[in-house]
Structure formats: C-alpha cells, structure tokens
Amino acid sequence: MQLFIVKLDSRSSASNEILVLDINELRKYVSKHQLSFRGAQVHETNSEHSVRNWEDDNITMFFHTSNVFPSEKSVRHALFSRNSVHVCGPLNIGAFRDSLRVLQSPQFPIHTYGDDITVFDKLREFVVVPNSLAVVDMDTSAWERYTYSLFTDEPGTITLADETPPTISPTGRDSVSPVARFSPSISISSIAIGEVGSASKRRQRLVKQAKSSDKTPIPEIRLNKKDTVFAETGTEQASPKTEIVAATVHKIPVNHAEADKRVVVLKGRTKDKAQEVREVTSLARDTTGVEHELMQSVGDDSVQVSGELSGFGDESFEVSKTDVVGVENKQLALDRVPALEPCGEVSEDEELVSEGMYAVPLDLDIYAEKCPSPTPPNSPKKREKADHEPIDISSAMMKLRLIAAAFQKEMMAYDKIDCLSSDDPAYLLAQFCLRNLNGVFVPEYVEEHSSDEENADDPNQGWNGTPVHGSREIFEKLSESRLASMEMISNVKPIRWNSKKTTYAVTIERGNPNLIVTQSLTRGQSSQFRKVIRAFGCSTDYCLERLASRDYDAILMLMSSLSGACHATKSYCYLQIVAYGSFAAPECKELD
C-alpha cells in the first residue's frame, strides 16, 4: 500500500498535511468532483521524510498497515517533539505495543485504543498529555472512510471539512469525530509520494506466459524498491522445466513524473535433453500497469531489447550480461570472477548448465562431498582434520559462485568460506562479494550448535563465543584494501537467531536496510518458503553509530508480513528478537 502525504496550504499562516491511502483513489476522487490540484508539485520521498513532515501544531499521526511498524528513531522523534498517534491495522496491535516496550516508561506513556472510529473523540483528552503515544487499532476501511470524510464536494479545490466531520464507524453507526482543527477552504500545494515502512509494499508483480512448447507460465517476478528483480520459482503453476535465473530493471528517464517507464529484462532457462539455455524472455511495464512485450536477440555478451513503449515510439538499447544478472558497474563484474569448476571428477549426469558467465550446478551435493567442507566451530574432530592452509582469493571466489548459484536455484547454502582470518584479504573480498553479488548476504555458518545455547541470549557473543563485529569494522578493513566504499557496504547488517530448532538463512536486499528476506528450513520439513519481514530498528547511519560505539544492545525487532503460508492459515508468524551476528570467521586453531 502506498502512502501519500497531501500538503495543504491554508489561507492562514498555518500549513498542514493529511494522509491519503492510495493515489489512484485520490485521482478518482479528484476526477469525480472535478477538483484541481492548482499546480501542485508531485515529488517522491522516503517514509522517514514523510513521517517527519506530516505534522501540525497539535498532533502528529502515523498510519501503519497491519504488518508495518515505525522505526525507533521515528517514534522517539515524535515523542520528543509532539504528541503523536500511531494507527495500525487490526491484527498486530499487541505486537505493535510489544515492539514499543523499549520506549515505554513513566515519562513516555503509551495509550492503546480500540478499533472504533469514534476513538478520535478520545484524542481530545490524549493531546493534552505531553510526550505520550497513542496506538489506535483501526481497520483499514474504517480509516479510509474517516480520511475521505475530511474532503468536501466543493468544485475547484480539495478542502477539509469543518471541525466535526461526520464519519461512519465500523459498526455502521454515524458518529462525529473531531481531530485537529483544520481551516476550511485549504487547497493542495504539493503531494509527497512516500511508502509505508519498507519496500515490499512498493512491489509490482509481473506475470508472463513463456513461449516454450508446453506453455508453462514464468514464475512470479517482484520488483523491489531498488529496482532489482527477484524471481520466485516452485509455485504450483510454474513448471520445474522453466526457471528464471536472472533479471534486471532498466529505467527510461522521462520528464513527467507520472510517465516513468521501467523495462524488465528476464533471463530464462528451459531445460531440455541437451541441458541448454533455450530462451530469454523480456517485457516492459509502465506505471499504468500495462505490459508490453519486447523483441529480443541474445548475443555472446549482451541482450538486445527493442520494441514500442507508450509515448516513446520504437526504442532499442543493449544491456550487458553482467547487468542482466544484477551486477552493476560499481560492483564486481562477473567476468572478473574465475569460472566455477567442480572438485574432482563429474559424471555426465552432473554436468553444469552454462548460462553465459553464470554456471549453475545441477546437483550441489557433489560440491559438498568433494570440496573442502566448512569447519564447524563446535566440532573438535573436524577441527583436527581441517586443512589449515590459507585459502586464496580464487578459491574463495569459486565458493562464492557456488553460493550464488545455490540461491539462484532457491536452495539453502551455508557460507563455505571457513578458516579465514577476519584480516585475510580473501575473507574480506568474500564478505564484500556476498554483500553485492545478486544483492544477497549469506551469514557465515548459520546453523544451530549445542554449545550456542548458553550464549544464545548474549548479544555480545557470536557463534563460537567470538566477539561480535559490526559493519563499521569490516568497512574499515575493506577501505584499507580498497575493496569497497561506504555506499556499498553500509546497508548490510549480519543477523542471526535461533527459533525453536529452526534454521534460518538470511539474505538482505541490496541497498535496502529495512527489508530482509528469509528462507526457513525446518528439519524434517520438505517445503521451503520465503517470508518478507520488516526490521523494526534504526536507520543505517544510526545502526553504524551504535555498532561503532560497541553498543551491542542495538537490536532489530522483526515481525512477519503475514503473507504467504502464514496469511493462508490466518496465523501469526512470530520471530525472535535478534542481535547482530558475528562477522568473525570460525576459529580454526589446531587442538593439542
């Protein structure tokens, strides 16, 4: 759900903003009542900026869907500066209140209200309490009815209703719900287009039928905030014979804000007897949701995309294969990475499927058996047998290719970069690539060990009792090696947690510190699924600052998006409070 902040300029000196849930609904309302924006400026802004600027002299109000929660920084800002109300969806008010318990104190009381729209009557009493927080559990439809009740039907301008606009409660009873005293006859001066929470609500879904002989649909493609496409496979409708292995989004710059066009290039693979790449599918999408099929041709080094886009005529451009697999110019290009070669001999049945510069193994078990395995930090026997010779960069990069290939196949993979010192250039290069290659981060050896239980609740301890290292330390070492810049490394945070004998692998979308994608693997459970969860925490700079000061009590409160399997069963998906995990490599000292 998009969040639109409509800034209003009144005839008086005061200026206010109100919240509109959906821009399409706003356009419908404007068209229906022949209203005018009167030269309003439309600009995009992030959620933090929107929250900070949606304020008036009396009250600050934030809207959150049932699975989106404010950052601690935003809440503290509201508490210290103004009285505020947080409106959340009907399912998670308890979790919302729990997530704010770190802030609750006698100095900053938190008041909880029910889901009746008449709760705004009570806010008159609330606003006189300084530095307090109100949490309103309100159904989205009720909030919509309340929001639109602020508009009048006067042609020419969008104005706010008088002090006591009539509204409809969820029970159907008419009621009067005064909020702040807005002046009537206020025209729109600008519209700030923001997002609620993080990027998942911004995602658009593109589904296209493949041109293969069996007419199987291509799996769902999701666009995230940073214009990186993640392909999901394994759905009931998708045939296992057709798999999208890479995709990227290309923006076509335009002058008009509403005419933004995005071209999505998908790299598809259809297995046949020869195990060859058979097709590349491309499509484009504009902001109106219309999909345009494009013509394409595949060369040795690039993909040629051409076709007609709305308002632009025939367009043709090239994208390199490094772009197709999501590696940008500022990152390590795949052509600099040594080719992935299996350890030992490989039978004909285990041959790799070559996809340009990307090699995906059909059976990852052959690598696990024949390649040097990671040294578990709590396995003395394996420590004794471990090969303690330094691992060179080529070897580390080979393992990185293996890990990336595993994620492309929607499979679980552990970080196999073991026995490397945190000062080792190979380790630093490996960690850097893990943060940038395909936009995923593979935590090092994320697995439950018996000896971890005693340290499970200690945020100062890593997997083997090793001290926790933060992004700042890794960045400083990478800077010394000239392997990274702050822009590349700052948005990645390592996370670990244990939850009732369930092993999680955590990946973080490139460039978006607020969105975390998890794959859950429960022992004995055959199905794997992804959940999109949001981090209730702090901004990147704030987190780095706390890590730099070794304030390891900085935690992330994670809540499920109640989507996918969890939403289908109408159950809650609780996750544990997590601490920053260890960047330190497992210790590989020989035992006496």
Curated annotation (Swiss-Prot):
One of its GO terms (cellular component) is host cell plasmodesma. Residues 450-469 are annotated as: Disordered. The keyword Nucleotide-binding applies. Signal peptide: none annotated. Keywords: Host cell junction, Host-virus interaction, Inhibition of host innate immune response by virus, Nucleotide-binding, RNA-binding, Suppressor of RNA silencing, Transport, Viral immunoevasion, Viral movement protein. The keyword Mitochondrion does not apply. It is found in: Host cell junction, Host plasmodesma. Transports viral genome to neighboring plant cells directly through plasmosdesmata, without any budding. The movement protein allows efficient cell to cell propagation, by bypassing the host cell wall barrier. Displays sequence non-specific nucleic acid binding activity. Acts as a suppressor of RNA-mediated gene silencing, also known as post-transcriptional gene silencing (PTGS), a mechanism of plant viral defense that limits the accumulation of viral RNAs. This is Movement and RNA silencing protein VP6. The lineage of its organism: Viruses, Riboviria, Orthornavirae, Duplornaviricota, Resentoviricetes.
